[in-house]
């Protein structure tokens, strides 16, 4: 199994519970496809480098997980359609 890091930029204008629900949904998607979430890091609210959907700030989350090589594509496909996620990036971590 490979190690991956999924970075989520979540809408800053939503309530805390909605933001937590978006992160939980991302974790659920990872586990649904056979991945194991090892760590979730909340980096807090940060200013965006450029405006996204008329927003200047977003909450950053880093989700570390282990999975087979086919899982990141499935995860990205589902996260792409989540309403409260402004941007995402899934990268393979070095061993």
Regions flagged by a language model, labelled:
Residues 2-95:
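Structured, basic alpha/beta domains of bacterial-type, RNA-associated proteins
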């Amino acid at each position: 199994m490979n190690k991956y890091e999924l970075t989520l930029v979540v809408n800053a204008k939503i309530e805390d519970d909605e933001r937590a629900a978006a992160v939980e949904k991302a974790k659920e998607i990872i586990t649904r496809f056979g991945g194991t979430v090892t760590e979730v890091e909340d980096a807090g609210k940060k200013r965006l480098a450029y405006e996204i959907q008329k927003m200047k700030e977003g909450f950053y989350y880093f989700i570390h997980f282990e999975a087979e090589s086919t899982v990141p594509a499935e995860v990205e496909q589902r996260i792409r359609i989540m309403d409260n996620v402004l941007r995402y990036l899934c990268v393979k971590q070095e061993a």
